[in-house]
Structures are given as structure tokens and as C-alpha cells.
A protein has these predicted regions:
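Residues that define the transmembrane beta-barrel architecture of outer-membrane proteins
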Residues: 2-6, 52-56, 77, 93-99, ...
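Outer-membrane beta-barrel translocator domains and adjoining extracellular loop/strand segments
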Residues: 34-43, 82-89, 120, 125-132, ...
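Structural signature of Gram-negative outer-membrane beta-barrels, strongest in the C-terminal barrel
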Residues: 1-78, 96, 106-108, 118, ...
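Extracellular loop and loop/strand-boundary signature of outer-membrane beta-barrel proteins
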Residues: 1, 38-47, 84-90, 96-100, ...
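Strand-connecting loop/turn motifs
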Residues: 17-19, 64-68, 106-110, 122, ...
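Gram-negative outer-membrane beta-barrel transporters
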Residues: 77-79, 91-206, 268-272
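C-terminal beta-signal and adjacent terminal beta-strands/loops
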Residues: 198-205, 223-273
Length: 273
């Protein structure tokens, strides 16, 4: 027996005389989704169970100043629906919507600058429909427990209740992220670069009881290129910012957060022969 899935996409754009290009894109993709262990379930084959991803995006972009200045603004909504291969932990149905902005400007032969902005919200549609989300609880989830040592050596599991759409937000994803970057080429083999990333605070866990603080990350570097060799030195987290990321937020977000690297250095040398 044979089952069919259909994927399609359509896009319309229009280039105006002044350089603006508005566009609209719609797409649908049918995919056979594997389970947590990369297995294909027998029921999936017999039922012809496909996952469907829907995307709708519109925006405007353009190039100006002899194509030295480029920008793009997009607003999108995406939903992956129909099938969950392993309950709601690894393959849940999600709804994503957001806005993205990008700017690149080649100011002259020496200097290139860029900026970006991302606003995104991701919702666990499966949890909304079922009214709950399974997870491991941390001490912050158990407000009546005053002695945290009572939980040492074990783990409390249960279901987080989902009352509304906002309580079904996927954790670990900052709603707003801002970026700036610049590269200066001295035209003598040397170049320097710097970048800045600023991210909002965000919940670490689906239960929304643990909050990861906002952070500002600055990186900088220097590069040299000769005829036969190149060398570079990059300083990551220049200001030694203390920040964290979530670890499997739908499941372990109340129990574990991961510290990111403090200030560190990366050096690279290459020789061509």
C-alpha cells in the first residue's frame, strides 16, 4: 500500500522603482516524523501518518546606495501540526510567530556594519490542547517544601497545568534579541571586528518558575592575512558577562540551567602551500 504526502510553496514579490521589494510567501510541507530514538512506528506506516508544517510570511526588503545598503523586514507565522511521534516531550506541535529585521551597510572599502532584531514567540499547541505538560519538578515548583534537601537524591515528576496560551509558551527562547556588528579592514592585511548581542530574560522551565536573566554579550577580534598565511585572535565574551541557557526546558528546565563560557580566547593560524 502506498501513501502520498504533498509539499508546496508559493511566493509573490514586486520590485518598486525606488528599490523596495514587498513579498508574500506561503508553504506547506509533509514530513514523516521519527520518534525519540529515530524509529518509525508501525502505526505511522499503516496509517500513513504525516506531519504537516505550515508557513506564512510577508515582508519588505530592498537594496540602496548602489547596493551597498541592504535591509529586510519579515513577519511570519509557522505551525507544525497533525502528528506527534513521542508524546509531547520531543515532537510536540508548535506554533511560532515573530518578526525579523536585518540591516547591512558597506559604508566604504574599509568599514562594514550590520544590525539585526528578532522577536519570536513559540507555543506548545499539544500542551494547550491536552491541558498539561509532563516534566521534572524543581524546588521552585514545590512552594510548600521549605527544606530543599528533602529532594536530594531523587526527582519529583508530574504535569504542569496549562490554563491559557501564555502558559504554553516554550521556555528558553528570549522574546527579543538585538544584534550589532562591525568590521574594519585597514587594507594592509589587518582587519578588526566587533559584535554585540543583547537578549531578553526568559523562563528556563515550562512551569515558568525559573527565570534566566537578560544578558549583553560582546565579542571582538583581529585578523591578519599575508600572501601565504593568515592569523586571527578572537576574544569571546569580552566583558566576562555571567549568563545562562536552558537545558531541555520542556522536561528539565526547573532542575538544570547551563552556565555559558566566561571570557575566553580563540587563536587560529593557517599556512597555504
Amino acid at each position: 500500500e502506498t501513501f502520498d504526502g504533498v509539499s508546496w510553496n508559493a511566493s509573490v514579490s514586486f520590485k518598486t522603482e525606488i528599490g523596495f521589494i514587498p513579498y508574500i510567501t506561503a508553504a506547506e510541507q509533509a514530513t514523516l516524523v521519527a520518534g525519540q530514538g529515530a524509529e518509525i512506528g508501525v502505526g505511522q506506516v499503516s496509517d500513513g501518518a504525516f506531519d504537516t508544517s505550515d508557513l506564512f510570511e510577508y515582508g519588505i526588503k530592498g537594496s540602496f546606495l548602489d547596493d551597498s545598503l541592504y535591509f529586510a523586514l519579515s513577519i511570519y507565522e509557522q505551525e507544525r501540526t497533525d502528528f506527534s511521534a513521542q508524546a509531547i516531550v520531543t515532537n510536540s506541535t508548535t506554533e511560532n510567530n515573530g518578526t525579523e529585521f536585518e540591516l547591512r551597510w558597506v559604508i566604504n572599502d574599509n568599514l562594514v556594519v550590520g544590525a539585526g532584531y528578532t522577536n519570536i514567540k513559540v507555543y506548545n499547541v499539544t500542551a494547550m490542547e491536552e491541558g498539561n505538560q509532563f516534566g521534572f519538578f524543581g524546588i521552585e515548583d514545590l512552594s510548600s517544601v521549605t527544606d530543599a534537601s528533602l529532594l536530594y537524591g531523587g526527582a519529583v515528576i508530574g504535569f504542569n497545568l496549562v490554563d491559557d496560551k501564555e502558559s504554553a509558551r516554550k521556555a528558553g527562547i528570549p522574546e527579543n534579541i538585538y544584534t550589532l556588528n562591525a568590521t574594519y579592514d585597514f587594507q594592509n592585511g589587518y582587519a578588526v571586528n566587533a559584535s554585540l548581542v543583547k537578549a531578553d530574560e526568559t523562563f528556563s522551565s515550562f512551569s515558568q518558575v525559573v527565570t534566566l536573566p537578560s544578558y549583553t554579550l560582546i565579542n571582538a577580534g583581529i585578523f591578519y592575512e599575508a600572501d601565504s598565511w593568515t592569523a586571527s585572535l578572537n576574544i569571546k565574551n569580552l566583558t566576562d558577562e555571567r549568563y545562562f541557557r536552558a537545558n531541555f526546558p520542556d522536561l528539565f528546565g526547573s532542575q538544570i540551567v547551563l552556565p555559558e563560557l566566561p571570557r575566553h580566547y580563540q587563536a587560529k593560524f593557517s599556512y597555504k602551500f
